[in-house]
UniProtKB/Swiss-Prot annotation:
Binding annotation for 2-[(2R,5Z)-2-carboxy-4-methylthiazol-5(2H)-ylidene]ethyl phosphate: T136, G137, T138, G166, V186, S187
Organism: Clostridium botulinum (strain Eklund 17B / Type B)
Protein name per Swiss-Prot or TrEMBL: Thiamine-phosphate synthase
Record-level GO cellular component terms: cytoplasm
Binding annotation for 4-amino-2-methyl-5-(diphosphooxymethyl)pyrimidine: Q39, L40, R41, E42, K43, N71, S110, K139
Catalysed transformations (reactions): 2-[(2R,5Z)-2-carboxy-4-methylthiazol-5(2H)-ylidene]ethyl phosphate + 4-amino-2-methyl-5-(diphosphooxymethyl)pyrimidine + 2 H(+) = thiamine phosphate + CO2 + diphosphate; 2-(2-carboxy-4-methylthiazol-5-yl)ethyl phosphate + 4-amino-2-methyl-5-(diphosphooxymethyl)pyrimidine + 2 H(+) = thiamine phosphate + CO2 + diphosphate; 4-methyl-5-(2-phosphooxyethyl)-thiazole + 4-amino-2-methyl-5-(diphosphooxymethyl)pyrimidine + H(+) = thiamine phosphate + diphosphate
UniProt remark on cofactor binding: Binds 1 Mg(2+) ion per subunit.
Described purpose of this protein according to its UniProt entry: Condenses 4-methyl-5-(beta-hydroxyethyl)thiazole monophosphate (THZ-P) and 2-methyl-4-amino-5-hydroxymethyl pyrimidine pyrophosphate (HMP-PP) to form thiamine monophosphate (TMP).
Amino acid sequence: MKNKIDYSIYLVTDRDLMSTNTLEEAVEKSILGGTTLVQLREKECSSHDFYETALNVKKITQKYNIPLIINDRVDIALAVDADGIHIGQSDLPATVVRNIIGEDKILGVSAGNLDEALKAQKDGADYIGVGAMYSTGTKKDATSTTMNELREIMKKVSIPVVVIGGINKERIKDFNGINIDGLAIVSAIIAQENIEKSTRELKEEFDKLNTLI
């Protein structure tokens, strides 16, 4: 599965922002709109609740054959047999996580600059999440990554790159010609009143990239 992943529209969940009654409903609507990858991020809940939520979300992602990535929690990822794990710079080292999860699961690593991106690739990451590209309410302590830094990362790494941080429909065109592999999106999907429609519009804008003159 790892070699055939479509990173184009990468939903990162946030329970506090969702417009729906349940997280499962939000995830399913986003998939129907064109989400190609789902990362379950639960920062506040107990391990038991995270586990139960992950099992429920996995039923939906499996139904549509969409990979499920767990944020930070290697134990939860293994417990529910998720497709992969995404870690930040302050989490367990990527080399350690790779040893724990094995070669078959997807490993994503956040990187804010070229050095972090190169180290992530060297340490066994399957993809890199670069950002924050813009200021964002979901990660108030995230430092911003410039477009020039992104271009440099794209030149130097050979694994897929997704951008994250304040991505919305209007900003997608900023990435024209940079050849990113995907958009990791939080509020522009999960906080929208019509999640399916919003996701579809984001996918349409992403598909226009690199074709604009």
